[in-house]
């Protein structure tokens, strides 16, 4: 038996979750947009996924959390739907093309054929742009990263022949969603004095990249049993690394060692970034770097308790449950009303 508590996080990476009022507000929105029928099962699915918001952004107020909840709604609904294989490759590509167009141009790709998810994504884009106000460079940075992420979904889901950790991590640099989540943290504070050019600083890029690796590592362990259950585990290193290093136990040791190394690098890069930063921007940069640490620590806390990953066959003790009230996410995702 294994435990997710084997992942060690510094104390300042962990905060109690924020108030969950935003989740119920956003659930009403997705029902109004007809993404879900309003019932107990869809609420449980929605809460079980979008509760990640209050863990990833624990210091944010209600208005900030609304933006973050809408962002994670788009991510989870789109990713779950495409991962579920309820669409064929052509339909998947078409949906991604339409969503990219909405984020890029702020309107619908085909005004004669508009799905509910397209309507919601446009609503999310418009409300987020309004929230950011004049800091359009923050908004544009977010658009770049979410478009990159959307375009990474299908290639990763269909990369069923991954057989080495380097190739996997190259995919996960974008597909983990950490760059997008961090850019969301940046636009949640539109009054920040941080220079958007921080994103082209190679040390900050490595800082964010390692954050992506850490989140992917945590998610791989948390979602392992769920992915086996749905035959989506071929791209999970807990599976494919067994062909190289032997037992699950050996693979888990490799992953924990990798996790410790990248977390140490994150801390060291943050120290140097703050040291080199102009004094007038230092507090804002510190807010941004701590935001990423809270995203990673929050993802860990959420993974320990969320119903999304519960499976009696999980190798991790925190996720084992026979609770009949726990609804596997794939029992709901096929009810998403994308058409």
Curated annotation (Swiss-Prot):
<dbReference type="GO" id="GO:0046872">
    <property type="term" value="F:metal ion binding"/>
</dbReference>
<comment type="similarity">
    <text>Belongs to the terpene synthase family.</text>
</comment>
<comment type="function">
    <text>Terpene synthase that converts its substrate farnesyl diphosphate (FPP) into the sesquiterpene beta-barbatene as a major product as well as (E)-beta-farnesene as a minor product. Is also able to convert geranyl diphosphate (GPP) into a mixture of monoterpenes including (Z)-beta-ocimene, linalool, beta-myrcene, limonene and alpha-terpineol.</text>
</comment>
<dbReference type="GO" id="GO:0051762">
    <property type="term" value="P:sesquiterpene biosynthetic process"/>
</dbReference>
<dbReference type="GO" id="GO:0010333">
    <property type="term" value="F:terpene synthase activity"/>
</dbReference>
<feature type="short sequence motif" description="DDxx(x)D/E motif">
    <location>
        <begin position="79"/>
        <end position="84"/>
    </location>
</feature>
<protein>
    <recommendedName>
        <fullName>Terpene synthase 9</fullName>
        <ecNumber>4.2.3.-</ecNumber>
        <ecNumber>4.2.3.15</ecNumber>
        <ecNumber>4.2.3.47</ecNumber>
    </recommendedName>
</protein>
<keyword id="KW-0479">Metal-binding</keyword>
<keyword id="KW-0456">Lyase</keyword>
<dbReference type="InterPro" id="IPR034686">
    <property type="entry name" value="Terpene_cyclase-like_2"/>
</dbReference>
<feature type="short sequence motif" description="NDxxSxxxD/E motif">
    <location>
        <begin position="219"/>
        <end position="227"/>
    </location>
</feature>
<dbReference type="Pfam" id="PF19086">
    <property type="entry name" value="Terpene_syn_C_2"/>
</dbReference>
<dbReference type="GO" id="GO:0102881">
    <property type="term" value="F:(+)-beta-barbatene synthase activity"/>
</dbReference>
<dbReference type="InterPro" id="IPR008949">
    <property type="entry name" value="Isoprenoid_synthase_dom_sf"/>
</dbReference>
């Amino acid at each position: 038996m294994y435990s997710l508590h084997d992942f060690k996080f510094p104390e300042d990476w962990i905060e109690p979750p924020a108030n969950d009022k935003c989740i119920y507000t956003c659930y009403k929105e997705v029902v109004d947009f007809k993404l879900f029928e309003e019932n107990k099962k869809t609420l449980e699915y929605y809460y079980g996924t979008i509760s990640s918001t209050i863990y990833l952004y624990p210091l944010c107020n209600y208005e900030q959390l609304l933006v973050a909840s809408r962002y994670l709604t788009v991510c989870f609904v789109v990713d779950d739907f495409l991962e579920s294989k309820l669409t064929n490759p052509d339909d998947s590509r078409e949906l991604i093309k339409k969503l990219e167009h909405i984020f890029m141009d702020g309107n619908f790709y085909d005004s004669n054929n508009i799905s509910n998810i397209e309507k919601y994504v446009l609503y999310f884009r418009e409300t987020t742009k309004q929230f950011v106000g004049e800091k359009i460079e923050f908004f544009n940075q977010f658009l770049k990263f979410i478009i990159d992420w959307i375009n990474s979904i299908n290639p990763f889901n269909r990369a069923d022949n991954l057989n080495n950790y380097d190739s996997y991590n190259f995919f996960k640099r974008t597909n983990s969603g950490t760059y997008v989540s961090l850019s969301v943290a940046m636009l949640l504070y539109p009054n920040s004095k941080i220079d958007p050019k921080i994103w082209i600083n190679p040390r900050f890029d490595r800082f964010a990249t390692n954050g992506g690796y850490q989140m992917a590592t945590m998610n791989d362990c948390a979602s392992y049993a769920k992915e086996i259950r749905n035959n989506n585990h071929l791209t999970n290193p807990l599976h494919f690394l067994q062909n190289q290093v032997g037992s699950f136990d050996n693979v888990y040791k490799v992953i924990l060692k990798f996790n410790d190394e990248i977390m140490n690098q994150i801390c060291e890069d943050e120290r140097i970034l703050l040291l080199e930063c102009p004094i007038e921007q230092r507090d804002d940069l510190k807010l941004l770097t701590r935001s990423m640490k809270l995203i990673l620590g929050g993802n860990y806390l959420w993974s320990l308790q969320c119903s999304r990953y519960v499976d009696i066959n999980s190798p991790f003790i925190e996720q084992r449950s026979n609770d009949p009230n726990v609804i596997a996410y794939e029992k709901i995702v096929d009810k998403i009303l994308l058409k």
